[in-house]
Amino acid sequence: MDTSSFETDLSLFKYDDLEALPDEYRELTPTARTERIEAARAELGDDVVVLGHNYQRREIVEHADFVGDSYQLSKEAANADADYVIFGGVTFMAESADIITDDSQSVILPSMEASCPMAGMAEALQVDAAWADITAAAPDETIIPITYMNSYADLKAFCAEQGGLVCTSSNAHRAFEWAFERGDKVLFLPDKHLGENTAHRLGMADATVEWDPWAAEGKTAEEVADADIVLWDGYCQVHERFTPEHVAEVRADHEDANVVVHPECRREVVEAADVVGSTATITETVADADPGETWAIGTEIHLANHLQRWHPEVNVVPLCGDACMDCNAMRQIDPNYLAWVLEELVEGRERNVIEVDSEEAELAQVGLDRMLEL
């Protein structure tokens, strides 16, 4: 596949129409910021709901009405009666919320710079070109595309249009089973590690091939034709950082340590862990732990910090200690931005509203509905 012509058309950040934070808000002290957020929320009342992803910093989570993973928060958005949904997350999450909420509701992302790099690793132009190459390599086979929830609305729409669906980290294995009941081959996007871990779970570890959209030569037709699962070469920069050595080190430092990791981690890390699951699973695992147990957390550092605070009776440690990363995209949701968008709503002005194209939204909803039927 020749990708040379794509270079000027592709961007890892889908939303570039961001509004700069006014200087007044950049200079707010933490105390003044909190007071103004609380005052604006009091004035807006039930007209606004604030959602905070598990990976958000403490200053956002403390102002959130609901805290959870992206799918949990989208469901909370759909159930909310509020006119305004402020999403403390990243762009693909706000898109999903916009798709499933009522048309009368506005979904607001405090900072448009909160763009997930992994979601940006599978852009529509690349996927269209890859789909043409992959289907040409296996012309007599039915290929079912599956996209992880961590993707933009246009990719969700593409997968639905081609007969595929959306999945979460919790139901990826059921999505694969669904696809193989209807087709011969799966194209999984954008996270290769979740795809590989799911293939292992289904006993199909040797049936995969990795597709690098940036490699001009792509994969040979024979490699694609021989594989049952084509894995898009995308990944989470936070979770890819974890290594088996981190697991060994934490077990050496804590004799009775248990290790729980996210399935976006490398296969070798998943194999070395005691429990593997979504952020909801990680949260539940620590909540159910006996007092005095040690749990090493292999995911974004803010969730590990939240769990330490929420469950002081459990010894919660980051899997890679001080080297554990925060998510740079999540970090863009600064509490000063939250104060700004709230006070703008008080004045009747909506800032940074996420609006998915209606045709894309309709198709993406089909992919989400297929997931819900699993």
Swiss-Prot record:
Gene3D superfamilies recorded: NadA-like
Catalytic reaction annotation: iminosuccinate + dihydroxyacetone phosphate = quinolinate + phosphate + 2 H2O + H(+)
Pathway: Cofactor biosynthesis; NAD(+) biosynthesis; quinolinate from iminoaspartate: step 1/1
A GO cellular-component term linked to this record: cytoplasm
Residues bound to iminosuccinate: H53, S70, Y148, M149, N150, S169, H262, P263, E264, T279
Keywords attached to this entry: 4Fe-4S, Cytoplasm, Iron, Iron-sulfur, Metal-binding, Pyridine nucleotide biosynthesis, Transferase
Biological processes annotated in GO: 'de novo' NAD biosynthetic process from L-aspartate
Enzyme Commission number(s): 2.5.1.72
Annotated Pfam families: NadA
Protein family according to the UniProt entry: Belongs to the quinolinate synthase family. Type 3 subfamily.
Function: Catalyzes the condensation of iminoaspartate with dihydroxyacetone phosphate to form quinolinate.
Name listed for the protein in its UniProt record: Quinolinate synthase
Annotated source species: Halobacterium salinarum (strain ATCC 700922 / JCM 11081 / NRC-1)
